[in-house]
Amino acid sequence: MATEFSWDEIKKENVDLERIPVEEVFEQLKCSKEGLSSDEGAKRLEIFGANKLEEKSENKFLKFLGFMWNPLSWVMESAAIMAIVLANGGGKAPDWQDFIGIMVLLIINSTISFIEENNAGNAAAALMANLAPKTKVLRDGKWGEQEASILVPGDLISIKLGDIVPADARLLEGDPLKIDQSALTGESLPTTKHPGDEVFSGSTCKQGEIEAVVIATGVHTFFGKAAHLVDSTNNVGHFQKVLTSIGNFCICSIGLGMLIEILIMYPIQHRTYRDGIDNLLVLLIGGIPIAMPTVLSVTMAIGSHRLSQQGAITKRMTAIEEMAGMDVLCSDKTGTLTLNKLSVDKSLIEVFPKNMDSDSVVLMAARASRIENQDAIDASIVGMLGDPKEARAGITEVHFLPFNPVDKRTAITYIDESGDWHRSSKGAPEQIIELCNLQGETKRKAHEVIDGFAERGLRSLGVAQQTVPEKTKESDGSPWEFVGLLPLFDPPRHDSAETIRRALELGVNVKMITGDQLAIGIETGRRLGMGTNMYPSTSLLGNSKDESLVGIPIDELIEKADGFAGVFPEHKYEIVKKLQERKHICGMTGDGVNDAPALKKADIGIAVADATDAARSASDIVLTEPGLSVIISAVLTSRAIFQRMKNYTIYAVSITIRIVLGFMLVALIWRFDFAPFMVLIIAILNDGTIMTISKDRVKPSPVPDSWKLNEIFATGVVLGTYMALTTVLFFWLAHDTDFFSKTFGVRSIQGNEEELMAALYLQVSIISQALIFVTRSRSWSFVERPGFLLLIAFVIAQLVATLIAVYANWGFARIVGCGWGWAGGIWVYSIITYIPLDILKFIIRYALTGKAWDNMINQKTAFTTKKDYGKGEREAQWALAQRTLHGLPPPEAMFNDNKNELSEIAEQAKRRAEVARLRELHTLKGHVESVVKLKGLDIDTIQQHYTV
């Protein structure tokens, strides 16, 4: 008998559980093949810890300080140092007010960043908990699905195709597994693991199904030890590069402005040292978009949370910007475009042996199905029995071969009541035909039936049986007998056709990727209105038998196709690769372990609901709800998130140019020294307002969108220059003319620098903050309603700014209130000079894309006279097209706009009802055609009584 070791020795790995016989493993871990009890599992969890890697604890204070450590903050910190070190000259004391103000601005910004990121981090942690790996574990004598984190040494687990091995374990009795250890060892090919072998946490099961006993968890696993030696890295992606580019542009603009001021103020104008420093501080403080990293990060975090509420959990934050730019979506058919709720019409089952009927074929198929942990096919087959227990009634299961992508079938070896051994198998018809070695007329008949099913959009399932005279599970048995073919109907989702239409309107081309036959793909594409321009997977390799495809380059074929049939996972990778070579932003859905390479290769890998652990691990976005509509909703939400970020970056660049150019010209032309403290007030109020943009109401782009730095910089420079010139014009009117006195009847403030300071402060504050309403809108800013928070923040900030301009009397900032009369005049001037900003925006967009004027009149923007943005008109056109497709006469008065006959509400109700009926008819007719043609009838000879 083996020496027993204590838990402490096992924890310290003094016991070689990897090499000792499996029987000794059970002895050392004090467990059995009945599994652990829940109480014992809880005790061991306290000893060995949770089955997850150690998370480094964060120092909250250092994290807070970290928000002050970036290039933009460095510029502000340099300004703070200037205020107390370089400003200490010219017979004046250090500028403590500006120093304190800058530090307050930095602390406010860091505090908001810290709080928002902490909240976002907590929300993300809660979301990622939903993606925590699950495993099938034997506890209290029952198999159940539990979170992998509760596993302890001694637990019995089940590993099947697509699972990521949750802990280091030793395999028990069963068939060998194919294990992909590339994530751990770098081996590109799967390795075969036999009973008794060790499998490592983090590896992926590529084939087979077996039970195993856990020997190590968490940091004690092979993967845990390796991960402990290296620090994780975060891929900053394109977002960080864009952020850096914009930050560098702003810093360079400020540097250029400061250089010009230094070269003119000191050698030419002979300004005093302190006045020059104050003017340089104005450019430094006012020009830096200090809130930019915070605003953009918070916007993405909040957007990610919103996506999760819609059923799309983002594992990689920057996937949001890629989703916004996606223009091609390669979608699985089964479960995404269809319901994956299979049904079998027993009357259409094709039985081949003369001594069997359809019930016998169903029973054979049910025996080759799982009773528990079923997939959609198993559930539909077993569900046809009166009682699911009939599938195992009167037989003893010896061995079950689970489905795998290579064999594409399942099989059971069993003993009947008389003691004879048998096997039954079900699977892809071609595999079953090959298994049975069908020849001649029987093979031709099988293919005719399969093709007949496929033409009507029905999948085929082959069923076979054999006897096993040798009575061993390893023996080949007698020749297989082809039993029959079952038609599987997987109805399209009720919203798939409408969702595909929406996707096309949004500029996203949906391509169907299916492993089914070409005829099934074409029929499904016809029903969903996504086109029938589909090709077999052989065309991807240039082996198509269709002569019309021979001369077409493969990448062009992939780009123009509506979908591909007979696709294997490796084909998906090739499709993504070719689309990316054609400069498309490509999304790919997947659910199986073999989809992982394509999901990783795609710009946006999307693991559908109920995907395997391997597919989830490789994806960027994990869906928690089935269907295509979740993806399209996520596209819209991503575009809205991206629009908010782009709006802010244009705003930030504009403000930098506006502050640098405006104050530089005022300082150099009139030698007017604007107080740095007043720029700080503008910056603080601006930051407070701009933080709300992360929750702003925006209209997503109607086409795929992406970062276009030339658009951001061009728009920012033009708008910023215009605003700077309006400030220069305002100062000239107030400083050198009596324009405001004559126009608004206010007293002149010429020569009164303190009141000029107040007036200039208010003008800069108003137009700077109002700019956000221009950059946030695609159309006219006054017709696209902003979010409530943004509007309230703007009103409060400008109320504070106006009160400061009217009443302030701060000697250290050289400001005295200019009164309500001047404040009113400044507001009128600001409103008048605000109006051309929209026109400038359109001109810039037109110059860059040639499409800007559409934003003034297009139905996709808010500025339109069409009700619901033309939705009713589009629905009417769709309904009319469907009536024509079904041979129905056009309605005479269905869409009559005569308001004397029908009220507008009744008209809309009729239109909705018409559209709903036609959609139902569209689906019903397809089903009727399927059944009628399978019965060998001519549908044209049958009287039609379609009524609407």
From Swiss-Prot:
Family membership: Belongs to the cation transport ATPase (P-type) (TC 3.A.3) family. Type IIIA subfamily.
Key words, A-Z: ATP-binding, Hydrogen ion transport, Ion transport, Magnesium, Membrane, Metal-binding, Nucleotide-binding, Phosphoprotein, Translocase, Transmembrane, Transmembrane helix, Transport
Transmembrane stretches, start-end: 65-84, 97-117, 247-267, 277-294, 647-668, 674-696, 713-733, 755-775, 788-808, 817-837
Single Gene Ontology MF annotation: metal ion binding
Keyword Kinase attributed: no
Function, as annotated: The plasma membrane H(+) ATPase of plants and fungi generates a proton gradient that drives the active transport of nutrients by H(+)-symport. The resulting external acidification and/or internal alkinization may mediate growth responses.
Organism: Arabidopsis thaliana
Annotated PROSITE patterns: ATPASE_E1_E2
Membrane topology term: Multi-pass membrane protein
Pfam families: Cation_ATPase_N (PF00690), E1-E2_ATPase (PF00122), Hydrolase (PF00702)
Tissue: Expressed in guard cells, roots and leaves, and barely in mesophyll cells.
Cytoplasmic side: 1-64, 118-246, 295-646, 697-712, 776-787, 838-948
Record-listed E.C. numbers: 7.1.2.1
Residues carrying Phosphoserine: 930
The protein's name in its UniProt record: ATPase 8, plasma membrane-type
Ranges in the topological domain labelled Extracellular: 85-96, 268-276, 669-673, 734-754, 809-816
Residue ranges, annotated region (Interaction with 14-3-3 proteins): 946-948
NCBIfam families: ATPase-IIIA_H (TIGR01647), ATPase_P-type (TIGR01494)
Subcellular localization(s) per the UniProt record: Membrane
GO cellular component, one term: plasma membrane
Subunit relationships: Binds to 14-3-3 proteins. The binding is induced by phosphorylation of Thr-947. Binding to 14-3-3 proteins activates the H(+)-ATPase.
Gene name of this polypeptide: AHA8
